[in-house]
């Protein structure tokens, strides 16, 4: 983020900063977003991959330590044969932890563009309101 501030005219602060990713990037966007909730006001995950080690992301990590407004969106496809039900597991954990979030389930969506496109569309439109 310092590179962006140095080289581009950008707005700073978590109200102007988002992170989202697909598959392994989706898992990492959740990890980074929750770990650095002071930097990101918008967190998205498209078909997020499972955690490969038990200590990388725990259930207790999937909650915010402070009370603030944010957007958290997780998208999943009903026909995803790569991450299977992993996104649903994140969704269930967020519910268990009473973390408000948008659960975007794409009927007939797979681990590809027919799930990615709707996520990007809805995520960006939720952030940048006209």
Locate each region found by the language model:
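Non-catalytic cap/lid and distal C-terminal segments of serine-dependent acyl enzymes
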Residues: 1-130
């Amino acid at each position: 983020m310092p590179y962006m501030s140095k080289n581009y005219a950008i707005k700073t602060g978590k109200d102007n900063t988002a992170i989202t990713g697909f598959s392994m990037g989706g898992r990492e966007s959740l990890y980074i977003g929750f770990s650095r909730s002071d930097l990101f006001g918008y967190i998205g995950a498209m078909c997020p991959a499972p955690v490969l080690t038990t200590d990388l992301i725990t259930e207790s990590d999937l909650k915010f330590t402070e009370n603030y407004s944010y957007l958290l969106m997780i998208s999943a496809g009903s026909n995803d044969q790569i991450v299977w039900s992993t996104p649903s597991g994140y969704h269930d954990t967020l519910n268990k932890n009473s973390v408000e979030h948008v659960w975007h389930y794409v009927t007939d969506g797979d681990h590809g563009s027919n799930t990615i496109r709707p996520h990007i569309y809805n995520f960006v439109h939720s952030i940048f309101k006209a």
